[in-house]
Amino acid sequence: MDNLKEKPLSYNINNNNLNNNNNNNNNNNNNNNNINNNINNNNFKYVSFSESLEDIGYQNQYIIDKDEDYYIQEQRYIRQNNQSDDEEDFNNNNYEDSIKISLIQKSFIKNKKNKIIITTIVVLLMIAVSLGLILAWQGVFDQIHNNNNNSKDE
């Protein structure tokens, strides 16, 4: 009892805070151990901060341009649970390839509209030129025919 009287009130408060901190630290350590056990037991596939869920197996369908109605299905690389962790089975090159493919498809789609318009114009010009040539030759033949008739009449 004498010891309690000698100690100031703040001592008991500080002591309680220390005990609470120790309990919190123990709980945090237990939680971390559970997470590590899950990772080691393959219940949870570890994803680094540089990867997103899309990188490891999300299939995304999206519109390339808001003003166009073209959809491109971008297939991301999927790692199944039974596959090994070798670099050949899973790396970011597959993801980069899918991005490159979708960019090529995007430029192709944009060029496709332009190609159709240009092709239509070229075909119409060719038809006009061919009709012009036909009419010109027709005029030449008519003139020759008329000249022949005129020479016979004389």
UniProtKB/Swiss-Prot annotation:
Organism expressing this protein natively: Dictyostelium discoideum
Biased composition (Low complexity): 12-37
Annotated compartments: Membrane
Keyword Coiled coil: no
TM annotation in the entry: 116-136
Glycosylation site list: N82, N149
Region (Disordered), start-end ranges: 1-37
Signal sequence extent: none
Entry protein name: Uncharacterized protein DDB_G0277605
Membrane topology classification: Single-pass membrane protein
Gene Ontology cellular-component annotations: membrane
Keywords for the protein's UniProt record, in alphabetical order: Glycoprotein, Membrane, Transmembrane, Transmembrane helix
